[in-house]
Amino acid sequence: EGLRVERTLVPLFAGGTTVEFALDPSGGLLLDVAPVDLEKQSLSRALSSAVGAEGQGIWSDFTRRTPVAAYISGDIPEDPWTVILAMLCAVRFPSIDEREALQWAPELSRQFAWIPDSHVLLARGLLIGAAPEDRVGAASEALRALSTARRLGAPYFAYSNTLLGDMLTALRDGAPEAEQRTQATKEMGYWSRHLPHQRAAGSSFSWVMSSGARSRGGLDERYSSILAFGSVDASTLTITPVVKPID
């Protein structure tokens, strides 16, 4: 209907990524982004599960079959998306030691400093690993990491966005120094400003454009590579690929 533009950053998992469109029973359109690899799909399904017990069951079954160290280790592979996915699952479903998983977050954020999610995980590791006497320094470093994540832009995974909000709330209410609480409140203001427009596409994060011509359902071909057009009615989803002439 040309009513909105919804955007998502697609994680390019090793082995491939699928982007699926489906009809919502209410007549809208659902978007799901997931890895092609079946084991990685398990991680994605666990993380995107709306029911915590269901996700916990998927994660527990996964960790019985597959050593988590195969995905989270000091030798960060050229697939940061799966590393992030596994770390996020370890945070949400702590059937393994969360600290064990997050010990590699500094290396992840160093190698892939352009991925906002890596800085969110770094902040999480700093906060849960701090000794009582190190709380002030840990809070300052965590705030720096969360500010970096926010300035880099939208995260790739919806749960990263949830964690960012949770940590800012905790720091706003309980950081050891007043200046840190003030900084967390300021960051919280930036984050919550766009809260009504935030969505999820499977385990991936998506958001609805909320201002200007970009919010009216059309993509400007000067700034977008349009691969396909589609339409939805009560029972059918039609996708038509764009065929561009070869020069």
Predicted regions and their residues:
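Extracellular beta-sheet/turn segments enriched in Thr/Pro/Gly and aliphatic residues
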Residues: 4-50
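Amphipathic alpha-helical repeat scaffolds of TPR domains
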Residues: 30-60, 64-67, 73-93, 113-128, ...
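Alpha-helical repeat scaffolds
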Residues: 57-71, 97-109, 133-153, 175-198, ...
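Extended, charge-rich alpha-helical scaffold/interaction domains
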Residues: 82, 199-218
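Short alpha-helical linear motifs
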Residues: 128-130, 209
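Long, compositionally biased low-complexity segments enriched in polar/charged residues
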Residues: 143-151, 155, 162, 169-173, ...
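Short, low-complexity, Pro/Ser/Thr/Gly-rich segments in the mature regions of secreted, periplasmic
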Residues: 236-246
